[in-house]
């Protein structure tokens, strides 16, 4: 799977029986999990995690990574960047492949308690850890990219990090492992990165420094390349009722050139 141009992303296929047992374990402990999420997010003035699994409206589907319905999900960015001077962009380095399964217990029970009872398989959070390993042939490092179970498990850890960050920072959002924070000064922006890095290290995660940047505001909400494609599309649509092959080919070539430059 190619998430970005020339950047491969390996999708994982779980051990079938192991994945079934993990799903059952999550189902059996769903009340504790939802209560955990409620506790971790109750103090948020807005939903920090913008992309997460949630029950779908008006459908029998159990889950979907749906975050496009602004009527229900809201769009907090216009409110939180007003008056701010800087935008911080940070990313977790190899987030899913780097997650240590024991860190799930650290988040659910607290690091000290989880380490004291690491071998007690009667504890619900240790069972989640155990079956997470089992779905990946007993490995303790890494969540598979693809299964919804991985999104639930990663949110357990990332929501614990959010809980600590929101005590100090109110104007930031997170798209899975991608953070955007708006600040009043460059010093505050740099401090956010320091604090984020410290919180990530508590769960053996690292920032991707190649994607870390501090930008001075204001900035365009929509990237320039998107505007160019929209303008090109508008020109095609207004020309006539149909588009011939040469125009389509020229449009595709134009788009490919933009991709190669981005």
Where are each of the predicted segments found?
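Catalytic palm subdomain of template-directed nucleic-acid polymerases
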Residues: 103, 108, 180-199
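Short, well-ordered loop/turn elements at secondary-structure boundaries
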Residues: 81-84, 148, 167, 175-176, ...
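Short, flexible loop/turn elements at secondary-structure junctions
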Residues: 92-96, 183-185, 214, 218
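Conserved two-metal-ion catalytic palm core of "right-hand" nucleic acid polymerases
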Residues: 1-145
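Short, glycine/acidic-rich hinge or "gate" loops at secondary-structure transitions
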Residues: 39-43, 116-122, 172-175, 183, ...
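C-terminal polymerase-core module
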Residues: 190-262
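Active-site palm subdomain of RNA-directed nucleic acid polymerases
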Residues: 116-117, 152-177, 181-184, 189
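Hydrophobic (often cysteine-bearing) scaffold residues that line and stabilize catalytic clefts
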Residues: 18, 96, 150-157
């Amino acid at each position: 799977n190619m998430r970005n141009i020339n950047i491969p992303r390996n999708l994982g296929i779980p051990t079938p029986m192991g994945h079934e047992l993990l799903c059952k374990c999550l189902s059996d402990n769903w009340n504790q999990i939802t209560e955990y999420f409620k506790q971790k997010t109750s103090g948020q003035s807005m939903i920090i995690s913008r992309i997460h699994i949630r029950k779908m409206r008006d459908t029998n589907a159990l889950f979907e990574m749906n975050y496009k319905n602004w009527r229900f999900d809201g769009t907090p960015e216009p409110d939180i960047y007003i008056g701010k001077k800087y935008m911080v962009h940070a990313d977790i380095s190899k987030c899913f492949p780097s997650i240590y399964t024991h860190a799930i217990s650290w988040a659910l029970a607290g690091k000290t308690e989880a380490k004291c009872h690491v071998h007690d398989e009667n504890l619900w959070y240790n069972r989640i850890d155990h079956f997470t390993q089992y779905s990946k042939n007993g490995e303790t490092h890494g969540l598979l990219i693809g299964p919804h179970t991985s999104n639930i498990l990663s949110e357990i850890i990332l929501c614990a990090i959010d809980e600590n960050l929101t005590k100090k920072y109110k104007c930031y959002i997170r798209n899975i492992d991608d953070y955007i924070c708006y600040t009043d000064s460059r010093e505050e922006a740099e401090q956010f990165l320091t604090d984020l890095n410290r919180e990530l290290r508590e769960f053996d995660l690292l920032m991707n420094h190649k994607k870390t940047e501090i930008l001075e505001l204001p900035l365009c909400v929509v990237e320039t390349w998107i505007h160019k494609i929209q303008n090109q599309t508008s020109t095609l649509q207004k020309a006539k009722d149909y588009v011939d092959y040469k125009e389509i080919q020229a449009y595709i070539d134009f788009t490919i050139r933009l991709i190669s430059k981005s």
